[in-house]
Amino acid sequence: MKRRKAREYVLQFLYACEMNENTQKICNYNFLQEEIEKFWERNYEEQNSDIKSFANQLIEGTIEHIDIIDKIIQKYADKWNIERMITIDKNILRFSIYEILYRQDIPYQVTINEAVEIAKKYSTKESAAFINGILDRIAKEEICHNKSAEK
């Protein structure tokens, strides 16, 4: 449950950045750190350092790889333009794809399940199914592709 709470904070952070049109600015490391610090000041009630640490890792990793992640979303989101996607759904996909591709310590099935549950809570049932389908395809195709490339 701690990690789900952290993922919910990541969604809030990414959503706020996009609504404030800060997505490109936060690619600057110093600006990103300032924004993360401000975010935790606004969410001062969260005292659990494990939650904050995991959330920070996901935020930093997602932002660091956001261009690659967005290209992957566009590749797998058949007939959907990423710019027209629901902001919540797009950002759930972003941090989940980061987890699937760059966090081998987290089983991709766990990541997908968490993304679906968060989508059900913050978006729609249709969004949950949409996110599940995209992440499942990405996990199977990208992970299998990477494993076969390693051989």
From Swiss-Prot:
GO MF term list: RNA binding
- Which keywords annotate this record? RNA-binding, Transcription, Transcription antitermination, Transcription regulation
> What Gene3D superfamilies has UniProt attached to this entry?
NusB-like
Q: Which GO terms describe its biological process?
A: DNA-templated transcription termination; transcription antitermination
Source domain of life is: Bacteria
Q: Pfam families under this entry? A: NusB
GO CC annotations, alphabetized: cytosol
- Described purpose of this protein according to its UniProt entry: Involved in transcription antitermination. Required for transcription of ribosomal RNA (rRNA) genes. Binds specifically to the boxA antiterminator sequence of the ribosomal RNA (rrn) operons.
* Homology family: Belongs to the NusB family.
Q: Which NCBIfam families match?
A: nusB
Protein name as annotated: Transcription antitermination protein NusB
Query: What species is given as this protein's source?
Result: Thermodesulfovibrio yellowstonii (strain ATCC 51303 / DSM 11347 / YP87)
Q: What is the lineage of its organism?
A: Bacteria, Pseudomonadati, Nitrospirota, Thermodesulfovibrionia, Thermodesulfovibrionales
